[in-house]
Amino acid sequence: MEVFLIKALQLMLSLSILVLLHEGGHFFFSKLFGVRVEKFYLFFDPWFHLFEFKPKNSDTTYGLGWLPLGGYCKISGMIDESFDTEQMKQPEQPYEFRSKPAWQRLLIMVGGVLVNFVLALFIYSMILFHWGDDYVSTKDMTQGMKFNTEAKALGFQDHDILVGTEKGEFKTFDGDMYRDISTASRVDIIRNGKPMSLNLPGDLDMLSMIKESPRFVEVYIPLQIDSVMKDSPASKLGLAKGDKILAINGKKVESFNDFQLELGRVGDVLASASTHQDSVKALTASVEYMKASSDTLKNNVLLLADKENVKFGFYNHPVMLDYKVTHISYGFFQSFPAGIKYGWNVLAGYVGDMKYVFSKEGAKSLGGFGALGSLFPSMWDWHAFWMMTAFLSIILAFMNILPIPALDGGHVFFLLYEMITGRKPGDKFMERAEYVGFGILVLLLVVANLNDVLRFFGIM
């Protein structure tokens, strides 16, 4: 419960910052061009609000709603998600959105997206200035990588060290590395201490590379018992630090990657068990191991968990701690170009990955607030918090600029149409478009959060 609260608080604080500043972008340009803002709210307030106030001589009511799904800035004379059609029937007023020239209305609509994007670049810059950049380069991962059968068919071997492609060297083992490999025609590696290259098709499906079990490529993790949990199957077996597990159910496990894969297979069998007896049978495994103090091979049968849960109960040695960490420090002025470059790469990667959303697997990967919350660490960490806030700011900026009615991008699309053709879409058309866009957003919200629920119950 404590972990859930920490993640939930981080998500709520992050989204509150982003929503306030996003709506603040609309607010700023509205005030700049003399457009009246009727309401400025954090969180939505259907039926009631937690509190609100209206400063003296101000046209704007500020408030806090109770539904933490965002916020809004109600601008006079604008067809938006408030669906205030009565106002649009009244004569046009000089302080209304609809009375302003198209270029001013355009800036008001892109104000939120602009603020979110600039905010992300600023946060990344300040992170680099305050903490610097720490990472483990792929070429410094001396144990190399672990590859699945599809990768091995292309010529990769376990323990190959990935260096880069024709596009340049990999920085570290991350999503950018996967993106480069998926579109590369050549990958440079180090095998047995010698540099060499492999030819690639250039059109690998990145989503399949990541979704496959095992994945196309993973960091090779040696199987090294670091510590054993009390009263766990591992402790009942008498395992301790330094001992080696050699096989599970007759399947050889040479790495922690192999070990996790075999436990996953046990979990798959357990998931299809229909009776308690079947569950016990699935959880009963033969384990071949060797004590650090002896060269004698041992083989025992044990129950992998006391409950219907696959669990062995030991902590593996974190191999990443053995590798050289590269640290780059940035001065105040140096941090801005570095932060801008970093943020731009994040945006480019996110936009490039959007094509996978329209695939069957991509649709399953959609997530709602539960998925967003899970991205935050289980302990409060300001570095991780600001990194995630900057990332969410980029997502918010990109998603809002999509040409979907009810989003900023939908309004921008119709404004650009007006500026190019000189014809302004009618109010009735805009109202209908807003309803359609709102329906699309509600549907996406339901699907994304339904996916969270299905994942929580292990159905997806």
Residue ranges of predicted features:
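Functional transmembrane alpha-helices
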Residues: E2, E92-K100, E212-A247, K251-K252, ...
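Residue-level signature of transmembrane alpha-helical entry/exit and packing/kink sites
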Residues: V3, K7-L11, K100-M109, V113, ...
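Small-residue-rich helix-interface/hinge motifs
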Residues: V3-M88, M399-T421
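Alpha-helical transmembrane segments of multi-pass membrane proteins
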Residues: L15-V19, K74, N116, L392-I401, ...
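Terminal peptide-recognition signature
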Residues: H22-G25, L64, A151, H159-L162, ...
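Internal alpha-helical transmembrane segments
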Residues: G71, I75-K146, E434-F438, L443
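Interdomain regulatory linker/hinge segments that flank or connect interaction modules
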Residues: D84-I123, T165-S208
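PDZ/PDZ-like domain segments forming the peptide/carboxylate-binding groove
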Residues: I127-K171, M209-A247, K251-S255
